[in-house]
Amino acid sequence: WYLNAPQDPNYVYAAQTSTSQRMQVAIDKATTGARGDLAASLETKIESMTKSFTEEIDGELRESYTQAQKEITSKVLRGTSPKEKKVFQEDNGTWRAYVLMELPVGKAAQEFLSKMNSNEGEMYTRFRSSQAFKEMKEAVDEYEKEQQSGMASQNDSNR
């Protein structure tokens, strides 16, 4: 999984490795690096999903839109979780950690739509009419369906 990250249209993945004389520091460094990679991937994904929309808006709205994107990236990354983690001690005593972080695409889209709706009435109205909105809405719907399915199967197993 480190060299070949999983491919799933509903998730963004990032893998990192790091070393340290202390095991927890190696894990923390690898996790932080993977989150940084997720941030870059998330920003790229949001930018590509909304490129056609940003070309339609003027400079003032573009600035507000960019700020919303940064806030969303920051907020969503706090909810990332490690999918895989491997730690071992190398021959020289140094600890090496491998971490694979995952982020549900729908969660990012959900946060983005929520921020857009609360942030700028005019911008949200214009955004709703764009193809980018339709794509994000589909990602949110898929994420919510997946969350409900997960809760249903968890409830079934608790009975």
Specify the residue positions occupied by each region the protein language model found:
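Domain-level marker for long, solvent-exposed, non-transmembrane regions
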Residues: W1-R159
